[in-house]
Amino acid sequence: MNINATLLGQAIAFAVFVWFCMKYVWPPLLAAIEDRQKKISDGLTQAERAGKDLELAQAKASEKLKEAKVQAAEIIEQANKRRNQIVEAAKTEAETERQKIIAQGEAEVEVDRNRVREELRLKVSALAIAGAEKIIKRSIDKEANSDIIDKLVAEL
């Protein structure tokens, strides 16, 4: 056997093998590799997009939370104002009612005072007349001396 012929046969077999691989094996491998690279690239792009969407969603959620807190604070403030208004209105109404009751009580006291004063004047004038009758031992004619009695009542 000749080494050159063997080497030449092996070289031809290798060339045929390389040509066969380049023609039938290499294109599907390249297609699979490119497809895999594309899938990985798309996955990374989607991951980046998802990360950005997540950040955006978190920012929106944070903004909504801030708005809700502000709105809650406003509602609480309005409720406190309304409560204060109701309390002030109740205080004002109670003060008005108190003043009315005091005025009514003072009016009743004044009426009772005037009534008692008038009763006292009448009793004092009756006692004065009785005392005067006993002192001078004679009866005073009420109709004739009504001037004296009226002056006496007015002085008391």
Curated annotation (Swiss-Prot):
> Could you tell me the keywords of this UniProt record?
ATP synthesis, Cell inner membrane, Cell membrane, CF(0), Hydrogen ion transport, Ion transport, Membrane, Transmembrane, Transmembrane helix, Transport
Question: Where's it found, cell-wise?
Answer: Cell inner membrane
Q: What is this protein called?
A: ATP synthase subunit b
Function (record text): F(1)F(0) ATP synthase produces ATP from ADP in the presence of a proton or sodium gradient. F-type ATPases consist of two structural domains, F(1) containing the extramembraneous catalytic core and F(0) containing the membrane proton channel, linked together by a central stalk and a peripheral stalk. During catalysis, ATP synthesis in the catalytic domain of F(1) is coupled via a rotary mechanism of the central stalk subunits to proton translocation. Component of the F(0) channel, it forms part of the peripheral stalk, linking F(1) to F(0).
Assembly and partners are described as: F-type ATPases have 2 components, F(1) - the catalytic core - and F(0) - the membrane proton channel. F(1) has five subunits: alpha(3), beta(3), gamma(1), delta(1), epsilon(1). F(0) has three main subunits: a(1), b(2) and c(10-14). The alpha and beta chains form an alternating ring which encloses part of the gamma chain. F(1) is attached to F(0) by a central stalk formed by the gamma and epsilon chains, while a peripheral stalk is formed by the delta and b chains.
Decide whether keyword Transport is in the record: yes
How does the protein's chain sit in the membrane according to the entry?
Single-pass membrane protein
InterPro entries (alphabetical): ATP_synth_B-like_membr_sf (IPR028987), ATP_synth_b/b'su_bac/chlpt (IPR002146), ATP_synth_F0_bsu_bac (IPR005864), ATP_synthase_B_chain (IPR050059)
- Residue ranges spanning the membrane: these are 11-31
Q: What is its main location?
A: membrane
Q: Does the keyword Cell membrane apply?
A: yes
One GO cellular component term? proton-transporting ATP synthase complex
Native source species: Psychromonas ingrahamii (strain DSM 17664 / CCUG 51855 / 37)
Instruction: Please give the family membership noted in the entry.
Output: Belongs to the ATPase B chain family.
